């Protein structure tokens, strides 16, 4: 089991361009973390909605995408290929993320990234779908399997401006529909 940080602000990740992303710099801002994949059926919808949310709250929201290949091998690109895959394949049409993508990682199992160990400990299941895990157990390629595991690509975690994990959303919850919760956390008129 991965080490579980004491605070959200103790965590970090490495961006696709190799820079350390220190979560301590996010104090006072809401943070949306989503495990992503460039070859999933909802890639276009979710990536464009992540861009939209980042553009709507440019100074008060941090969006972080964590590419992961644990679900249907739908992120089989190497780190250096991910941006080109997004630009030319899916979503395509010159798409460029306006948010930070970090290096590919595992979100479940023995080698899960510390960010996901922390978030799953604090938010053990999506509020909108607390009962689903994997639809097909043959697709589980990690061990150990836990009830709190991320079930598929594009699960989302929203963290408040004080660093408290607020809510976890399932893969079926449209990313753009998180906006009212972001406004609530940021105390913006809805």
From Swiss-Prot:
Compartments reported by the entry: Cytoplasm, Cytosol
GO BP: any one term: response to oxidative stress
Example GO molecular function: glutathione peroxidase activity
Pfam family name, one: GSHPx
Entry keyword Oxidoreductase: yes
Active-site annotation: 40
InterPro entries recorded: Glutathione_peroxidase, GPX_AS, GPX_CS, Thioredoxin-like_sf
EC number(s) per entry: 1.11.1.9, 1.11.1.12
CDD domains: GSH_Peroxidase (cd00340)
Main subcellular location: cytoplasm
Similarity comment: family membership: Belongs to the glutathione peroxidase family.
Biological role stated in the UniProt entry: Catalyzes the reduction of hydroperoxides in a glutathione-dependent manner thus regulating cellular redox homeostasis. Can reduce small soluble hydroperoxides such as H2O2, cumene hydroperoxide and tert-butyl hydroperoxide, as well as several fatty acid-derived hydroperoxides. Cannot reduce phosphatidycholine hydroperoxide.
Protein name per the record: Glutathione peroxidase 2
């Amino acid at each position: 089991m991965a080490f579980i940080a004491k605070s959200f602000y103790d965590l970090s990740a490495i961006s696709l361009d190799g820079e350390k992303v220190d979560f301590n710099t996010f104090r006072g801002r809401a943070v949306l973390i989503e495990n992503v994949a460039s070859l999933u059926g909802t890639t276009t919808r979710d990536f464009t909605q992540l861009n939209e949310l980042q553009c709507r709250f440019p100074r008060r929201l941090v969006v972080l995408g964590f590419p992961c290949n644990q679900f249907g091998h739908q992120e089989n690109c190497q780190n250096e290929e991910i941006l080109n895959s997004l630009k030319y394949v899916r979503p395509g049409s010159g798409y460029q993320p306006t948010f930070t993508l970090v290096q590919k990682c595992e979100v479940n199992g023995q080698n899960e990234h510390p960010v996901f160990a922390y978030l799953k400990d604090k938010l053990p299941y999506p509020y909108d779908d607390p009962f689903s895990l994997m639809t097909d157990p043959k697709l589980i390629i990690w061990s150990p399997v836990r009830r709190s595991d991320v079930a598929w690509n594009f699960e989302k975690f929203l963290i408040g401006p004080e660093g408290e994990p607020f809510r976890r959303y399932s893969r079926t919850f449209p990313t753009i529909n998180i906006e009212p919760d972001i406004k609530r956390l940021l105390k913006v008129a809805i």
